[in-house]
Amino acid sequence: INITDAHITNPKENYIIYSIAKAGLSTLTKSLAKELGPKIRVNAVAPGPILWPEKSNGFDENYRKKVISQTMLKKVGEADDIAKAVEFLLLNAPFITSHTLAVDGGRSFSSD
């Protein structure tokens, strides 16, 4: 299970290197699934707005509210949401491979 980012299809401004790395990891996920299948499944989880450290993230409260307003579930996720997605792909998804699972409260479905 690789951890990518919800912005792999719509990169954020000023995050060029990060975006390149995460997009590459997404392609690696698909390539490895093709190379290692059928014996090994390879998937990725793409976190969206996950609970940020309150004072250390560089985002002001207005930006945080904007992000939440663009999320269908109207909240940020928690690290446990990512862990549960990884667990699902490992233990309960034997017929899923080469997939990137967005764990973003529906934000990737909304427009930025």
Give residue spans per PLM region.
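SDR active-site strand-loop-helix element
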Residues: 1-6, 45-47
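Active-site loop immediately N-terminal to the catalytic Tyr-X3-Lys motif
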Residues: 10-16, 74
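A glycine/serine/threonine-rich, flexible loop-to-helix segment
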Residues: 49-70, 112
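C-terminal substrate-recognition "lid" of short-chain dehydrogenase/reductases
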Residues: 75-103, 108
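Active-site segment of SDR-like NAD(P)-dependent oxidoreductases
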Residues: 4-10, 32, 107
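Active-site helix of classical SDR
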Residues: 21, 29
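Alpha-helical segment proximal to the catalytic Tyr-Lys
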Residues: 33-38
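Conserved SDR Rossmann-fold cofactor-binding beta-strand/turn motif
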Residues: 41-51, 102-104
